[in-house]
């Protein structure tokens, strides 16, 4: 990927966060999790801590509920978001 990598740094800047909205989010094995709806920003550090994912696959997330994915799970971002890790599935509703 030629876009943003996560490394030890967190994405910063309003322009970057705006461009995340609507990107497809993929699991490490290539399955589509859903779409980025928004980013959660820590107000003290102004850094992204989570991506809020909508339209999740019901086979991966019970009830297709929206999901907050920790930034540390993100491997890289370009035209899509690729996760480095995702818990065993499906994610239960409770």
Which stretches of residues belong to each language-model region?
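Peripheral interaction segments used for macromolecular assembly
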Residues: 1-94
């Amino acid at each position: 990927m030629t876009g943003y990598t996560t490394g030890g740094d967190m994405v910063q800047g309003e322009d970057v966060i705006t461009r995340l909205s609507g990107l497809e989010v993929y699991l490490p094995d290539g399955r589509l999790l859903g779409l980025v709806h928004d980013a959660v920003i820590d107000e003290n550090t102004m850094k992204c801590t989570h991506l809020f994912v909508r339209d999740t696959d019901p086979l991966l997330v019970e009830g297709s509920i929206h999901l907050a994915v920790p930034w540390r799970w993100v491997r890289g971002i370009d035209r899509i978001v690729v996760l480095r890790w995702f818990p065993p599935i499906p994610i239960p509703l409770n």
